[in-house]
Amino acid sequence: MGSRVSREEFEWVYTDQPHAARRKEILAKYPEIKSLMKPDHNLIWIVAMMLLVQLASFYLVKDLDWKWVIFWSYVFGSCLNHSMTLAIHEISHNFPFGHHKALWNRWFGMFANLSLGVPYSISFKRYHMDHHRYLGADKIDVDIPTDFEGWFFCTTFRKFVWVILQPLFYAFRPLFINPKPITYLEIINTVIQITFDIIIYYVFGVKSLVYMLAATLLGLGLHPISGHFIAEHYMFLKGHETYSYYGPLNLLTFNVGYHNEHHDFPNVPGKNLPMVRKIASEYYDDLPHYNSWIKVLYDFVTDDTISPYSRMKRPPKGNEILE
């Protein structure tokens, strides 16, 4: 159903990602940006409050009709859970407690993970660091879709289905592209999460458990906030690999929309990324950017020139050190 996309292959490039060179140039001109590279201790209480709100919602939905359980999981729970995945993104960069307390951040990530219903935090951190170091690297960066995704989801309707199924692809894609041995922290993350899920089931009932899981699945699929998955690196304009978003949903997502700024300065917490743009405005104001994630989703589905193949990809150099 729907028209077929014109792209049949990834955009292969043989140059380094632009972020390291731009970071070096900006720091030489604006060394004060180094002062923004510091922990964000506010994340600790923000995440705790988010988890408490979600626990309260488990209580509020436990006796609702099923239609209202699903309704509120999409309208409210999905926003909270997607926001929590982006809090976990901040935690993966060691922002709550700082780099000198890396293990504290891993434990805090497991705490933040609780409201999602599925173990996520530890595995995300391992793959996300590879994404930053080796952006677009073949068989390393699992943010790049598989060849199957690019080949199969090649019509308007199929791209729409692909957007809905985004959380499943992000969950299983690493197993096909860059499988890693399981670590003890991932096992602990899984055991803690399953234990929490069982407690939710026995304390609140099956409706609260379904609400929690549906909020994660729906929130990471066809949802306004999910526009960031596509907006960040899908090549809407040839030659441009990373795009920022400067719209209001940054307030719910720890400024993940400031994505060029984030890749240029991964040691700057989200709350300080607007300052990076302000200080080095001449480097960012003229770069292509978005003001609406909803429009990004619409354009991705309806534009015949855009598909899961619309990513810049690099052959690995062979000297990569993976997490």
From Swiss-Prot:
A motif (Histidine box-1) lies at residues 89-93. It is a multi-pass membrane protein. Pfam families: FA_desaturase, Lipid_DES. SMART domains: Lipid_DES. It is found in: Mitochondrion membrane; Endoplasmic reticulum membrane. InterPro entries: DES1/DES2, FA_desaturase_dom, Sphingolipid_d4-desaturase_N. The modification Phosphoserine is found at residue 307. The keyword Metal-binding does not apply. GO terms for biological process: ceramide biosynthetic process; fatty acid biosynthetic process; myelin maintenance; positive regulation of apoptotic process. GO terms for molecular function: retinol isomerase activity; sphingolipid delta-4 desaturase activity. GO terms for cellular component: endoplasmic reticulum membrane; mitochondrial membrane. Its EC number is 1.14.19.17, 5.2.1.-. Keywords: Endoplasmic reticulum, Fatty acid biosynthesis, Fatty acid metabolism, Isomerase, Lipid biosynthesis, Lipid metabolism, Lipoprotein, Membrane, Mitochondrion, Myristate, Oxidoreductase, Phosphoprotein, Transmembrane, Transmembrane helix. Detected in testis. Detected in pachytene spermatocytes and round spermatids. Expressed in retina and retinal pigment epithelium by Mueller cells (at protein level). Its main location: mitochondrion. Myristoylation can target the enzyme to the mitochondria leading to an increase in ceramide levels. A motif (Histidine box-2) lies at residues 128-132. Has sphingolipid-delta-4-desaturase activity. Converts D-erythro-sphinganine to D-erythro-sphingosine (E-sphing-4-enine). Catalyzes the equilibrium isomerization of retinols. Belongs to the fatty acid desaturase type 1 family. DEGS subfamily. This is Sphingolipid delta(4)-desaturase DES1. It comes from Mus musculus.
